[in-house]
């Protein structure tokens, strides 16, 4: 592992200006708000939206003893690399790290190892991709990434808004009278809440105001009689 850490690249202040941070898709309703939170702090940030087509990509580098979420997450990163959408020098991978004993909690380290093995097999450019650990424990520090109070408050707002939109959307969508109306409202609410995050208005008072706004707008979606 010592050799591995010498290969894995540090995410520098210069990288913050030139690289896009890519996070695997885990929380559909929260992703759009996370993107707003990171961008508000000056990061170029995206969540991967490519659906996993071939999970066996991950099994080239890890055994099938790993849990299914681990396989899917690694496969999504690997499929993105194979797509050639961006040059390896333009991207950074980010992975939440729980730091526990569960294998899923150590996907961060596993992703580093996979990139290292790919570099060993001749794809040396992949060794230059920084991998950022998203955690609150101060592990795996990078000189160009820091969880600031602004990023933390934006992340909290993102989590709260994501859960709220999920509940409202799933309660209304199956019973909408006009097909597509709930999706339109969801997009409208997400746009307003993202703007609030981008303006660093993440305090409790503002969040509660936004909760009421979202509930009010969704409540006006026409639903089928009796629902």
PLM region spans:
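An N-terminal assembly and electron-transfer interface module characteristic of large anaerobic redox
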Residues: 1-227
